[in-house]
Amino acid sequence: WTWNGGGVRPGGGAAPDAVKIGDRYLIAYSATGGGLGGGHSGKVLTMWNKTLDPNSPDFKYTEPIEVASSVNDEDCDAIDAGLLLDPTDGRLWLSYGTYFGFIRLVELDPATGKRMEGNKEIDIAIDCEATDLIYRDGWYYLLGTHGTCCDGPNSTYNIVVGRSRKVTGPYVDNMGRKMLEGGGKMVIAAGNRQTGPGHFGLFKVADGVETVSYTH
């Protein structure tokens, strides 16, 4: 294995996602939170950059913008951001949350990266975390990581999916179970040599060419 590090975001943070909008990249990431030792208090922040290449002279982040937050007694952790720029209408959506509460969806302004004024979060799933949204042929797919992580060979992470005709849900698996009620079809599980696959990501290499990523 070869480690290829990227640019460091100001203020640290974890679990980033990025989407290209026009000639800029919008990055969403988490500050604190995560349940258990991390507590439930957290924030999801967004910032812009002209490039993701830390060696470029144009590499410079804008000031972070808070788009979601949670407090210690809340039923959702503001962590694990996932971005979707809807190809059907250009609207921008952010999912976030962990296994310790609801997965929530909010709408952002694609011009500013700020939360749309007056937008109220929507609960779309439970019993998963590190969600990502994909649009395909009239369907919105919600992928989430189910199970426990960070326990070596005892980790039970796996990736589940549901789909909906609307980005706001309801997301349903192949058996008709709603992800808001704990449903989700397993699509990636542990193998003989790998334990705990999670944090699904999709990367567009070129027109018609995409690759997926996940961690063990």
Predicted feature locations:
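Conserved blade-ending motifs and adjacent loop-strand segments that build the rim/top face
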Residues: 177-199
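Beta-propeller and closely related beta-sheet repeat lectin domains
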Residues: 12-17, 79-82, 129-132, 198-201
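Blade-loop segments of beta-propeller domains
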Residues: 1-21
